[in-house]
C-alpha cells in the first residue's frame, strides 16, 4: 500500500511548526495510519543533508551573498528535488506517511507572487523538482497578514521574513489563491494552538484521501 503525503502551508507565523509537533504526537495513534506504518516529519527547505546546506544559504547567507530571485528559485527547486527523491518517495513506497512543513505551494506563493517570477516558469521547474508528486492533503493555516506580523515581532527574522509588509501581503494573497485553486483544507490559524489542532484533526478524520483502501 502506498503511503500518504501531508503538507502544512501558510505564511510565516501561522503556527506550522507547533501544529507539526502536535500532529506527530496524534497521527500514529489516530486510527488513520495503517498498522506498521511510520510517520516521517520533514520540512522545506532542509529535509535532507543537501537541503540543510541550501537552507542556510537561502535564509542566512553570508554578507553580500544573498541570491537573486532567479537563483533563489533554483535553490528551492534543488532542495525539493533532493527531498522528493531521497526522502519522500522512498518513504511513501514503503507505505509510510510523510508530514512536511511546506512543499511546492510555498514556491508559487513566495517566488511567484512575492518575487513576481513567471508562474509558467515556476510550474515547469516544479514538474522536474516534484517528479509529479502531489500531496494527498494540504492543510493551509489561514492567518491574516496583520496577525502574522504581530506574531513575528517576538522572534528573530530570517532573510525571507525580513522582506517587508508589501512582499508578505503578496505572499498571503498568493496562498489564498492557491488554496482556492487546489482545494486545500483551510484551517483558521488565529485560534489557540489547541483549537487549531482540533480543527486539523476533524479535517483529517473526514478527508476522503486518507481513508484506507
UniProtKB/Swiss-Prot annotation:
EC number, UniProt record: 2.7.4.9
GO terms, molecular function: ATP binding; dTMP kinase activity
Binding site for ATP: 10-17
Catalysed transformations (reactions): dTMP + ATP = dTDP + ADP
Keywords for this protein: ATP-binding, Kinase, Nucleotide biosynthesis, Nucleotide-binding, Transferase
GO biological process, one term: dTDP biosynthetic process
Disulfide bond residue pairs: none
Functional summary from the UniProt entry: Phosphorylation of dTMP to form dTDP in both de novo and salvage pathways of dTTP synthesis.
Name of the protein in question: Thymidylate kinase
Organism per entry: Synechococcus sp. (strain WH7803)
Upper classification of the organism: Bacteria, Bacillati, Cyanobacteriota, Cyanophyceae, Synechococcales
Gene field: tmk
Amino acid at each position: 500500500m502506498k503511503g500518504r503525503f501531508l503538507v502544512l502551508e501558510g505564511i510565516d507565523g501561522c503556527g506550522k511548526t507547533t501544529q507539526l509537533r502536535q500532529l506527530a504526537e496524534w497521527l500514529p495513534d489516530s486510527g488513520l495510519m495503517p498498522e506498521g506504518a511510520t510517520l516521517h516529519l520533514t520540512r522545506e527547505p532542509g529535509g535532507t543533508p543537501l537541503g540543510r546546506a541550501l537552507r542556510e544559504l537561502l535564509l542566512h547567507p553570508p554578507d553580500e551573498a544573498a541570491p537573486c530571485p532567479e537563483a533563489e528559485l533554483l535553490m528551492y527547486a534543488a532542495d525539493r528535488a533532493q527531498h522528493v527523491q531521497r526522502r519522500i518517495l522512498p518513504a511513501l513506497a514503503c507505505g509510510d506517511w510523510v508530514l512536511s512543513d511546506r512543499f511546492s505551494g510555498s514556491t508559487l506563493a513566495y517566488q511567484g507572487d512575492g518575487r513576481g517570477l513567471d508562474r509558467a516558469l515556476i510550474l515547469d521547474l516544479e514538474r522536474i523538482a516534484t517528479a509529479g508528486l502531489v500531496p494527498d492533503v494540504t492543510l493551509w493555516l489561514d492567518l491574516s497578514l496583520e496577525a502574522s506580523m504581530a506574531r513575528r515581532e517576538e522572534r528573530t527574522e530570517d532573510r525571507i521574513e525580513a522582506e517587508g509588509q508589501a512582499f508578505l501581503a503578496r505572499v498571503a494573497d498568493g496562498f489564498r489563491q492557491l488554496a482556492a485553486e487546489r482545494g486545500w483544507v483551510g484551517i483558521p490559524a488565529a485560534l489557540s494552538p489547541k483549537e487549531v489542532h482540533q480543527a486539523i484533526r476533524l479535517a483529517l478524520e473526514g478527508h476522503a484521501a486518507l481513508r484506507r483502501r
